């Protein structure tokens, strides 16, 4: 049976920790979509691991890992990340990681084009990670991309890469890019990649009846190309639909869908953010929460928890349980606000609006809670949380339509987690 872990906000919710926890009992852990633009950190046995394209199930010694067909893979980053994990003690990691032959290749060329396209947008920049993800998915949609399996065929990837470069040169003029160097490296990767590349359909068939498959979502629902705050989104389907599509999942095999919700809201890059606090509150959340992007190092914008957004996310992803993260970051606040509705011209909106112009104008309606002003770092039992912290959690549960909050994160370590009976 399949468990899917999905971000409910703008990403950076802390999905890696619950994925790490669940992967301990998983036979197979999969990434379905996205690329090395994603990023999360896991602390295990006092060692900090940073993940981008690799599934975090690699930390579990008995878990096999797959990068699925809906992803885009920057091959140098794949090997660099794998080498970093091995250097930190995961010696057999390279024996437990595989890539779908249908995943697409993200070239250095795509990163160059990403920067040029952002520059063209001038004052309306999306705020991408600059990793080339958007141009890579564009090439995929335009049917001119290169699949991982094609790297293994002599001359195929090279011919397509040369064609891509010529097309971009016609569009942008001379590029700050060394085509021959990338061609040379991919000729070398042809042999190096061979042990990792699999036919996804045949590979997954072997695990069809296994009791525990874990799907690790990247980014989050509000960055989804269809359902997020378009155009300030990533270029892949980051919700439930993307997981099913990218891994050819049978929907009837899905046992649980875990929505990961940070106890406040953060966002990297540009785009609407109704509950953002551009004040001392936002600065405090940023500082105490150490809100810097794992992939880019950029400061994250911070604000109060937005239940309008979370309810919308739930309506699309159909969570069966919630993992609430970073509750301890709110320990020292006198009062804590939660957004429960948006108003436009004095009228409550029925749902999360699609139009950016509307989002920019909404008035946010908050419910204010008294803070608990005590240390919850490392708390592992529900009854040991302060009363006001428990009330905060229960209110979120109520606002999510009764979807139970099964896990509550109270610190960075794997052991800093409350697991409730729900």
Swiss-Prot record:
InterPro entries: Adenylosuccin_syn_GTP-bd, Adenylosuccin_syn_Lys_AS, Adenylosuccinate_synth_dom1, Adenylosuccinate_synth_dom2, Adenylosuccinate_synth_dom3, Adenylosuccinate_synthetase, P-loop_NTPase. IMP binds at residues 12-15, 37-40, 129, 143, 219, 234, 298. Keywords: Cytoplasm, GTP-binding, Ligase, Magnesium, Metal-binding, Nucleotide-binding, Purine biosynthesis. GO terms for molecular function: adenylosuccinate synthase activity; AMP binding; GMP binding; GTP binding; magnesium ion binding. It is found in: Cytoplasm. This is Adenylosuccinate synthetase. GO terms for biological process: 'de novo' AMP biosynthetic process; cellular response to cadmium ion; IMP metabolic process. Gene3D superfamilies: Adenylosuccinate Synthetase, subunit A, domain 1, Adenylosuccinate Synthetase, subunit A, domain 2, Adenylosuccinate Synthetase, subunit A, domain 3. GO terms for cellular component: cytoplasm. Its EC number is 6.3.4.4. Mg(2+) binds at residues 12, 39. Binds 1 Mg(2+) ion per subunit. PROSITE patterns: ADENYLOSUCCIN_SYN_1, ADENYLOSUCCIN_SYN_2. It holds the Pfam family Adenylsucc_synt. Its cofactor is Mg(2+).
């Amino acid at each position: 049976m399949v468990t899917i872990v999905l971000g409910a906000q703008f990403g950076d919710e802390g999905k890696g920790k619950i994925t790490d926890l669940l992967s301990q009992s998983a036979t197979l852990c999969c990434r379905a979509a996205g690329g090395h633009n994603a990023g999360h950190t896991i602390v295990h046995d006092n060692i900090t691991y940073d993940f981008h394209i690799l599934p975090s199930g690699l930390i579990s010694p008995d878990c096999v890992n797959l990068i699925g067909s809906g992803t885009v893979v920057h091959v140098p980053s794949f090997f660099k990340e794998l080498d970093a994990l091995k250097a930190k003690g995961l010696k057999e990691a390279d024996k437990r990681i595989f890539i779908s032959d249908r995943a697409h290749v993200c070239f250095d060329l795509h990163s160059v084009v990403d920067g040029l396209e952002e520059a063209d947008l001038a004052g309306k920049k999306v705020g991408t990670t600059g990793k080339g993800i958007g141009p890579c998915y564009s090439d995929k949609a335009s049917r001119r991309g290169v699949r991982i399996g094609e790297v293994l065929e002599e001359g195929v990837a090279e011919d397509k890469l040369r064609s891509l470069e010529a097309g971009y040169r016609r569009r942008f003029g001379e590029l700050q890019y060394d085509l021959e160097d990338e061609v040379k490296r991919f000729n070398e990767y042809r042999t190096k990649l061979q042990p990792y590349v699999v036919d996804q359909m045949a590979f997954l068939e072997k695990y069809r009846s296994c009791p525990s498959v874990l799907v690790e979502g990247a980014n989050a629902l509000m960055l989804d190309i269809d359902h997020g705050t378009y155009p300030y989104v990533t270029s892949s389907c980051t919700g439930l639909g993307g997981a099913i599509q990218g891994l050819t999942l049978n929907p009837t095999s899905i046992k649980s869908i875990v929505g990961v919700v940070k106890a406040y809201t953060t966002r990297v890059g540009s785009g609407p953010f109704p509950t953002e606090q551009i004040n001392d509150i936002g600065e405090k959340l940023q500082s105490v929460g150490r809100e810097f992007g794992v992939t880019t190092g950029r400061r994250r914008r911070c604000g109060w928890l937005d239940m309008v957004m979370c309810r919308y996310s739930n309506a699309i992803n159909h969570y069966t349980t919630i993992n609430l993260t970073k509750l301890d970051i709110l320990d020292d606040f006198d009062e804590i606000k939660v957004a429960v509705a948006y108003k436009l011209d004095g009228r409550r909106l029925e749902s999360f609006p699609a139009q950016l112009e509307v989002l920019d104008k909404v008035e946010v309606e908050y419910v204010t809670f008294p803070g608990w002003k005590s240390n919850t770092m490392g708390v592992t039992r529900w009854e040991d949380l302060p009363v006001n912290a428990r009330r905060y959690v229960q209110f979120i549960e109520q606002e999510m339509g009764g979807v139970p909050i099964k896990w509550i994160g109270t610190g960075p370590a794997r052991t800093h987690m409350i697991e409730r009976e729900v």
